[in-house]
From Swiss-Prot:
Compositional bias (Polar residues): 1-11
Official protein name in the record: Leucine carboxyl methyltransferase 1
EC number: 2.1.1.233
InterPro entries noted in UniProt: LCMT1 (IPR016651), Ppm1/Ppm2/Tcmp (IPR007213), SAM-dependent_MTases_sf (IPR029063)
Annotated positions binding S-adenosyl-L-methionine: 97, 123, 151, 201-202, 246
Disulfide bonds: none
Length: 398
């Protein structure tokens, strides 16, 4: 396919309208152009990122309504009247990304360890994973999981409004009485025994993490005298923990993104605690398709700041190693995951949902997004928590 035939990613949506880029939506592009210089420019960029969550929820709802995914919470967390049916390659991309991360999460939770586990989702927005997980687990299993979501205050406040308005969400979270949930007057934070929603700018974690000394493998406890207090209420640094970044860190500068991950891997959690990280991000910006993708974003003031820093599968694997996740690292693009992780029967089911004529375009698009995962097994009784990840196929090469 020549460069002139590469589809403009801004048009990959039914119903027209101006698109936005949203990391959790994944296969979306576009946003108003803003000046990035100075504090006003930075604030404007933050608003662009915050405002893209609606597109993510619409893409998810589109995939659900057509039958790609089962998610009774998608409609509840999508603003009324914003539903738009996406094109088939967008729906398939949403399906593959969602099911791939779901598989990795399930292997973590189903690990041989019986210890309580913890998930921390960065830039979670309107993501439904916590609701899907809790609704699919027994009451006993639900009590063995603590789920944290971190995002800008504007997005956490919006999610809390949805929760307050939807009995389905309240029941799923087990928020049966005022005694087991705390929401401040600001309305942008929520804390309960199993679910915490944090209105925190990740860059503040990066700043606090870079200002402290990385702990050594012999450090028994991160709460040492020179350790600043953790700004994330309810996070337990002794539990086996999984971090999830669905195209979230890519909005930060390479230094900020690295400092955010290091805050968790080298400051907050001691080396003895099993810790894993799942990253979903675009890759390969330097071929013809990638350059077109980047150019489309640039015309709307969007810059995926770490894209060139972690431009390949090998760069993503190296990134995981550099963050101290030494026990294992793997990565695969979405096309590989579709071909290798999805069964033939499931491929046939998905193919029957709607006609996908743009096979070559699908392959191009899918090869420019990846899932990367890495972990450290820690020490002690829970070193097998991430053993299930060893059986999942990664992709070799770049």
């Amino acid at each position: 396919m020549s460069a002139s035939q590469i589809p403009n990613l801004n048009t990959l949506r039914r119903g027209g309208g101006r698109g936005r880029l949203r990391g959790r939506g994944g296969f979306e592009t576009g946003a108003p152009s803003e000046d990035r210089h100075g504090s006003r420019g930075l604030a404007a960029q933050d608003r662009v990122v915050q405002g893209t969550d609606n597109d993510a929820s619409v893409s998810r709802l589109s995939a659900v309504e057509i039958g790609y995914l089962e998610d009774p919470f998608a409609k509840v967390l999508t603003p009324p009247g914003s539903g738009t049916r996406r094109l088939p390659i967008i729906n398939r991309g949403t399906y593959v990304r969602t099911t791939a991360i779901d598989r990795l999460v399930a292997r973590f939770l189903e690990g041989p360890s019986q210890t309580k586990k913890q998930i921390i989702s960065l830039g979670a927005g309107s993501d439904t994973r916590v609701f899907r997980l809790l609704s699919s687990r027994s009451s006993a299993s639900s009590s063995d999981l603590i789920y944290h979501e971190i995002d800008f205050s504007a997005n956490t406040a919006a999610k809390i409004k949805f929760i307050r308005a939807a009995p389905l969400l309240q029941r799923t979270l087990g928020l049966g009485s005022a005694q087991n949930v705390a929401i401040p007057d600001s309305g942008d934070a929520l804390h309960s025994p199993t679910y915490h929603l944090h209105p925190v700018d990740l860059r503040t974690l990066a700043a606090s993490g870079s200002a402290t000394t990385s702990r050594s493998p012999s450090s028994p406890n991160p709460a040492e005298k020179d350790q600043p207090p953790c700004p994330l209420q309810g996070v337990d640094p002794t539990l086996p923990t999984l971090l999830i970044s669905e195209c979230c860190l890519v909005y930060l500068s390479p230094r900020e993104a690295a400092d955010v991950v290091d805050y968790f891997t080298k400051t907050l959690f001691p080396a003895s605690v099993p810790l894993g990280l799942i990253i979903y991000e675009p890759i390969r910006p330097d071929d013809a398709f990638g350059r077109t993708m980047v150019a489309n974003l640039a015309t709307r003031g969007i810059q995926l700041q770490t894209l060139h820093e972690y431009a390949s599968l090998e760069a993503q694997r190296r990134r995981l190693r550099e963050h101290g996740l030494h026990s294992g690292q793997a990565a695969a693009d979405i096309d590989f995951i579709w071909e290798r992780w999805v069964s033939e029967a499931e491929k046939e089911r998905v193919a029957r949902l709607e006609m996908l004529d743009e096979v070559e375009e699908w392959q191009l698009l899918a090869r420019h997004y990846c899932v990367a995962w890495g972990w450290t097994s820690g020490a002690g009784e829970d070193t097998t928590v991430f053993d299930g990840w060893k059986e999942i196929d990664g992709q070799t090469g770049d």
